[in-house]
């Protein structure tokens, strides 16, 4: 009986089935509770399990419920009161969030490895590091109501693997004013040999750079205005050019490092929006990697900015009603978990249709919309037992099943909408009275229609 129902969903709602299978592979309930038990410090499970909290937050991230309160009210067997639920959410420790992101990425990585893909730099695993500050929350907490300034619930440092399109690690910071450089030392301590870290100038400090060097990892970091003091500087040598400008290179040495590092200078053909005409990169990559390759690799760092935009706009990572720092950070971490699942779906659909549509770029937004449209009905029609086997399925079996489902997806329905560059509009002076004036859209349209020859 259930197989017939599942077959109909496979044909008519393949994205929702793919999402459910991927979620079961990445975040099975039993595994979440095990991670919580192993990572918690002072928090106790009590009656409400951590898996139930993550399930509720995922419903909000995927757009299946408008808020945590609405998701909790629709949950049939919530074992605690709403007050107890919010107390649990407000006490979720950052160490638990990090363990969930690390573990779920590790569970999805073998499935991603079954799919086609090329490494950005042969022999190296890319890691893009950047920070994301959560916006000001509503002042619902009593101590915040008398504060005139914005209430910032915290920030996170995120590590992104662009080759596998997975967020592999995060560090959640409850103090919104805590230095990113200080927090980054936690991530650098976990760096491994064979990794190549990309970071902006904010992370150009001797402690971080030497940390990567000692871990036998490589780095490409943009030079900061107050960079570590240089003990040695070689002569500048021509290094060709890349797509955006002319390259030169020199060797540099700092205190405590016997082997010199590399300093790449890029003189841009056109200035940036901020008026910059050149930028400099530091790297400890071997000479076999050319300056052009280093410059092109650093340009990939901007992919994490697009990641933050998609997590915010598509997966509701910034829930302003959650004012407690730990609750807001839980919302962001859950959105990251959902993003990794959608990244797997995106890669599967693109590979399944590569022969027919080689340039297909699947939109994360349209994927999320597709999931929302059919997911609720699928959960009603099929019992939880229909999915439990996927939590222990092999990566090969999971990838094959997802690719089979992906062939039922219409590429046109999930493709990214292409648009041309925006045309700049002149911003002249306008009287304040004209700005405040209201107009009737219907009258303006009628007037414009009458003026058209």
Model-found features: residue ranges?
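Single, function-defining residue in the core of a domain
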Residues: 1-64, 79-92, 100, 104, ...
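A short, well-structured juxtamembrane/interface segment
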Residues: 108-117
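Conserved mixed alpha/beta core segments that line enzyme active sites in large multi-domain catalysts
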Residues: 143
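Short, charged amphipathic recognition helices of the HTH superfamily
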Residues: 63-76
């Amino acid at each position: 009986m259930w197989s017939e129902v599942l077959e109909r969903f496979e044909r008519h709602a393949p994205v929702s089935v793919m999402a459910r299978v991927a979620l079961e592979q990445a975040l099975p309930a039993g595994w979440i509770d095990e991670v919580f038990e192993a990572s918690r410090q002072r928090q106790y499970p009590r009656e409400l399990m951590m898996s139930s909290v993550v399930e509720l937050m995922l419903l909000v991230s995927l757009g299946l419920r408008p808020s945590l309160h609405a998701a909790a009210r629709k949950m049939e067997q919530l074992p605690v009161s709403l007050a107890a639920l919010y107390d649990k959410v407000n006490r979720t420790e950052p160490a638990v969030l990090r363990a969930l992101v690390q573990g779920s990425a590790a569970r999805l990585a073998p499935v991603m490895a079954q799919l086609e893909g090329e490494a950005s730099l042969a022999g190296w695993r890319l890691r893009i590091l950047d920070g994301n500050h959560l916006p000001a929350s509503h002042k619902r907490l009593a101590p915040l109501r008398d504060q005139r300034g914005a209430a910032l619930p915290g920030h996170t440092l995120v590590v992104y693997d662009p080759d596998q399109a997975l967020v592999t690690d995060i560090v959640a910071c409850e103090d919104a004013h805590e230095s990113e450089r200080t927090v980054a030392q936690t991530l650098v301590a976990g760096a491994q040999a064979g990794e190549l870290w990309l970071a902006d100038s904010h992370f150009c400090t001797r402690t971080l750079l030497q940390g990567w060097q000692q871990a036998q990892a490589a780095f490409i970091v943009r030079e900061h205005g107050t960079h570590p003091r240089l003990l040695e500087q070689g002569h500048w040598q021509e290094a060709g050019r890349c797509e955006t400008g002319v390259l030169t290179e020199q060797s540099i040495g700092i205190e405590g490092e016997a082997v010199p590092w590399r300093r790449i200078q890029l003189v841009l053909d056109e200035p940036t929006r901020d008026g910059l005409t050149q930028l400099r990169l530091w790297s400890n990559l071997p000479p076999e990697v050319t300056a052009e390759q280093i410059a092109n690799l650093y340009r990939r760092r901007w992919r994490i900015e697009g990641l933050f935009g998609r997590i915010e706009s598509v997966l509701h990572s910034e829930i302003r009603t959650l004012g407690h720092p730990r609750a807001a950070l839980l919302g962001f971490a859950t959105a990251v978990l959902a993003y990794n699942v959608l990244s797997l779906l995106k890669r599967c659909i693109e590979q399944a249709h590569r022969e027919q549509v080689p340039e297909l770029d699947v939109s994360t937004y349209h994927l999320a919309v597709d999931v929302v449209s059919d997911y609720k009905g699928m959960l009603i029609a099929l019992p939880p037992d229909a999915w439990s086997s996927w939590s222990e399925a092999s990566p090969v079996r999971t990838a094959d099943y997802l690719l089979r489902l992906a062939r039922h997806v219409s590429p046109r329905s999930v493709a990214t909408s292409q648009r041309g560059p925006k045309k700049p509009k002149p911003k002249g002076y306008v009287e304040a009275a004209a700005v405040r004036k209201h107009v009737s859209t219907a009258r303006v349209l009628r007037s414009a229609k009458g003026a058209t020859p």
